[in-house]
Structures are given as structure tokens and as C-alpha cells.
Amino acid sequence: MEELKKIAVIGAGIMGTGIAEVCARGGYDVALVDISEEILQRAKERIRKSMERAVERGKMSKEEMEKALGRIKFTTNLEEAARDADLVIEAIPENMELKKQLFKRLDEICPERTIFATNTSSLMITDLASATKRPDRFIGMHWFNPAPVMKLIEVIRGALTSDDTFNFIVELSKKLGKVPVEAQDGPGFFTTRFIVAVLAEAIRLFEQGIAGIKEIDTMVKLGFNWPMGPFELADFVGLDTIYHVLEYVYNETGNPAYKPPLILRKLVLAGYLGDPRQKPGSRGGFYEYFKIPRER
């Protein structure tokens, strides 16, 4: 594995924040980038609270926590963060053009050696890599929420990703305590294609009156031993995220299993983007819209 000293994480939302925390706890210097100081301040508080919980559970010492926090630089300056990074992990919203614009800019800023990893959950890696002049050093590194807890990293090669780049990300994932598993490039890869199809079908069954939201969640949790039901999971991930992923996969594949349900579109248009604890500014998710008490 090439020497890795500095990682730039672009996007300080829930995923980017979690990724930055894991990398810092793994001993790497991290620059966490976003467009506003307010977002970065929230990220800083979230990381500290997460590490404090880890200390309480005996996962790390207080001294280790302070050292890890000291490895993270929070900045709105993309060029400053990325120009000497050995690895850039992108974790901005799931929008093809937005991501391509970012990678085109990063391609101009970063040295040739820098590897680009995208945390996209659905967009094709080969398509994103086409915005750069380094498709051999471009790869999908799909983390799961919450990043400090979830073990899986889905690793996706683009059509031109080199073996060296693939092996680098696999070894890094292991060093960070994760389990890397390879999936092939395609809309939604494996994990996202699988889970959004399940969520869409649960929503359609609710629309058809087969069972209520709470009842569906209870049956899935008790019958299949899932930690969250499909509506709880949808609210946790974000209804807007699920809608856009379904729309993308449906448009790319034509498979009706991925056609976004009408009620999902209505909620997103009305500002119900998911659980407000996970989606600041959201009116709520399925549970709030249909006035169902949440289990706390």
C-alpha cells in the first residue's frame, strides 16, 4: 500500500462527518471540507459526541480521542484541503452533475498521485470518472451509515480503475477496521439496488392498503430480525435520497421495481425529507406525515 499521510473528505454531512471520524481514529490527518462554517461546526460537534460515546463504551481512551480530534482540520477552502492530499473521499449530495463538477475541479487542484474515491451509493463510477483525467485512480468506496459503526465498505471499480487503486482502497478499508467487499459497476451496484427495491415495495404495499406503516415495520423487525423496519429506515436514510436513487436506477434500467411510488414523490415535494434528527430542516418523514409516534 502506498504511503498515505493526508485524506481530504469533501462534504460534512452525516456520511462525510462519519468518514472523517473513522479516518482520524485510524491515525490519518484529515481535512473535512464543506461550503459553510455553520455546517462544519455541526460536524465538529457530531464527531466529538460520537467519540465521547466511544470513550464511554471503552472503545478508545480520552487521550486517543483528543489526538484523533486534533488530526481533523475543518475548512471551507477546497484548494487548501485537497492540494496535498494523497486520497480524496467525496461525500457530497447524490447528484451526477454536482459530483462531476467537483471532480473536474479536484483534478485541477490535486497532484497526479492523488486517488479519488466517491461515496456514491448509486451513480456509475465509470461515468463519474469521465470528468477526470485519472480514471485509473478513481474508485467507488461506498460507506454505510453510521460510518463509525457499520463494518461494510462496498468497493466498486470503474471500467478503467487500476489494480493498484483497487488494492489500495481494499487495504485501507481493512486498516480502518472495515470489511471491503467488491461489487461491479452499474446503477446502484448491489447494496443500493437491493435495499431501495425493498423500500419501494414496502411503500407500494402501504399505498395498496395491504398493511399500515407501523405494522409493516413491526413485521419486518420481528419476522426477519431487521434492526429497523423499511419506513424507519427510509426516514433514517432520507426520503429525498431514496427518491432520487430510485429515479436514477429506474431511468437507467427501465425495471419497474425501481419506479418511485407516488406517495414518496408527494412527501419529498412537500418538504418531508426524513427524520428531522438526521435531516436538518426536514418537516419529518413517513412517521411525522402520518402522525405515528416514533420509538425513541
Give the role of each language-model region.
Residues Y28, R83, P146-V155, P227-M228, ...:
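Acidic/polar active-site rim loop that often engages polyanionic ligands
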Residues A31, K73-T75, I89, I139, ...:
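Hydrophobic/aromatic beta-strand patches that form the interior of the parallel beta-sheet core
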Residues M1-R53, R57, I109:
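NAD(P)+-binding Rossmann beta1-loop-alpha1 motif at the extreme N-terminus of oxidoreductases
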Residues E2-E3, G26-Y28, N167, K174-D185, ...:
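NAD(P)-dependent Rossmann-like dehydrogenase/reductase catalytic/cofactor-binding core
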Residues I7, R25, A68-L87, F168, ...:
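Amphipathic alpha-helical segments at domain termini/boundaries
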